[in-house]
UniProtKB/Swiss-Prot annotation:
Annotated PANTHER family: 33 KDA CHAPERONIN
InterPro entries associated with the record: Heat_shock_Hsp33, Heat_shock_Hsp33_C, Heat_shock_Hsp33_N, Hsp33_helix_hairpin_bin_dom_sf
One GO BP annotation of this record: protein refolding
Entry comment on modification after translation: Under oxidizing conditions two disulfide bonds are formed involving the reactive cysteines. Under reducing conditions zinc is bound to the reactive cysteines and the protein is inactive.
Name of the coding gene: hslO
Compartments reported by the entry: Cytoplasm
Source organism of this protein record: Histophilus somni (strain 129Pt)
Key words, A-Z: Chaperone, Cytoplasm, Disulfide bond, Redox-active center, Stress response, Zinc
Name of the protein: 33 kDa chaperonin
HAMAP family the record matches: HslO (MF_00117)
Length: 286
C-alpha cells in the first residue's frame, strides 16, 4: 500500500517574527495498524483517530523523556478510550464499548457523564495527572481549555479524522504561544485565524511544506526535521502472563482444564494471541 508523502510524520515549526510555535502530524499507516485488529463503529474509529493525533501533538511538547496517556472514561455507550504515546512518537490505542453507538451521536451522547484524564509520566520523575470535564463539543476544544487552565498557554488545536482516498487518516495542527512570555495575544489570534481556514483535504493530502505555505505564505516559518510516528504496542508473553501470576495454582489448574490445557490471552491493543500451557506458566513463575 502506498501512503501520502509526509504521512506518519510529525513536524515542529516556529513563527520567527511572532513568538508562536506549531506542530503538524498526519497518521495513515499508524492509524491503520491501530485499527487492524478491531472493528470499531465509524464514530468510535474517528474519535480514536482524533485522540491519537492529540496525543502525538501533546507528546511533542514534552521537554523530557516519558509518555502521555489520554483516556476518556464515561458511563455512556463508549466506556473507555485510551491512547498512550511516548516522546519518541510510538503510540498505541484501544476503545471499549458497553452499548450500541450510532454515527450521528454527539460526544456527550457517546460518552455520557464522562471525563478526560491526562497522565504525564516522565521516565525519571513524578507522574502528573489532570482531569478535564468533557463539556465541549470536541476533544480538541476540551484540550484547548486544559492548556489555558493548567499551563496558562493560549493554544489552538485543529484535528480531523476520517478517510482520504479510501484509507483511514487522522491529522491535526497545534498552535501555541511561546511559554517564555514573548508572544503576544494579537499575533496568536492572527495565526489562529489563518489556521482555522484549513480544509480536511488539505490536512489529509498536502505535504507539511505545502500545507504551511497554503496557510502562512506571508509569514516567516522555520520548519524542523520531522519525527517518524509509528504504532507500537509493546505487549509480550511475559506482560500478558503477569495477570496469571496473581491467580492461585488451583484456579489456574481449573482454567487449564476448562480450556483444554491452554489459556488464550489476547492483547487489547494489537490483537496478538498468547497461549499459556502448564509449562509456560511454570516458566513465568520461576
Amino acid at each position: 500500500m502506498i501512503y501520502q508523502t509526509d504521512n506518519d510524520k510529525l513536524y515542529r515549526y516556529l513563527f520567527k517574527d511572532r513568538a508562536v510555535r506549531g506542530e503538524w502530524v498526519r497518521l495513515n499507516k499508524t492509524f491503520t495498524d491501530t485499527l487492524n485488529s478491531h472493528e470499531y463503529p465509524r464514530i468510535v474509529r474517528n474519535l480514536l483517530g482524533e485522540m491519537m493525533v492529540a496525543t502525538n501533538l501533546l507528546t511533542a511538547t514534552l521537554k523530557f523523556k516519558g509518555n502521555i496517556t489520554i483516556q476518556i472514561q464515561g458511563n455512556g455507550p463508549l466506556k473507555l478510550l485510551l491512547v498512550n504515546g511516548s516522546d519518541s512518537q510510538q503510540i498505541r490505542a484501544l476503545a471499549r464499548l458497553q452499548d450500541d453507538v450510532y454515527d450521528d451521536m454527539t460526544l456527550s451522547e457517546l460518552v455520557g457523564n464522562g471525563i478526560l484524564v491526562i497522565t504525564i509520566a516522565p521516565t525519571n520523575g513524578e507522574r502528573y495527572q489532570g482531569v478535564i470535564a468533557l463539556d465541549k463539543p470536541t476533544i480538541a476544544e476540551c484540550l484547548e481549555d486544559y492548556f489555558i487552565r493548567s499551563e496558562q498557554l493560549q493554544t489552538q488545536l485543529l484535528i480531523r479524522s476520517g478517510e482520504y482516498e479510501g484509507k483511514p487518516v487522522a491529522a491535526g495542527l497545534l498552535l501555541q504561544i511561546m511559554p517564555d512570555g514573548t508572544g503576544s495575544q494579537e499575533d496568536f489570534e492572527h495565526l489562529a485565524t489563518l489556521a482555522a481556514t484549513v480544509k480536511d483535504e488539505e490536512l489529509f493530502g498536502l505535504t507539511a511544506e505545502n500545507l504551511l505555505y497554503r496557510l502562512y505564505h506571508e509569514e516567516t516559518v522555520e520548519i524542523y526535521p520531522p519525527s517518524a510516528v509509528e504504532f507500537h504496542c509493546g505487549c509480550s508473553l511475559e506482560r500478558s502472563g503477569s495477570a496469571l501470576l496473581l491467580i492461585s495454582d488451583d484456579e489456574i489448574e481449573n482454567i487449564l482444564t476448562e480450556h483444554g490445557g491452554s489459556i488464550d490471552m489476547q492483547c487489547e491493543c494489537c490483537g496478538t494471541h498468547y497461549f499459556f500451557d502448564k509449562k509456560t506458566i511454570e516458566k513465568l513463575k520461576a
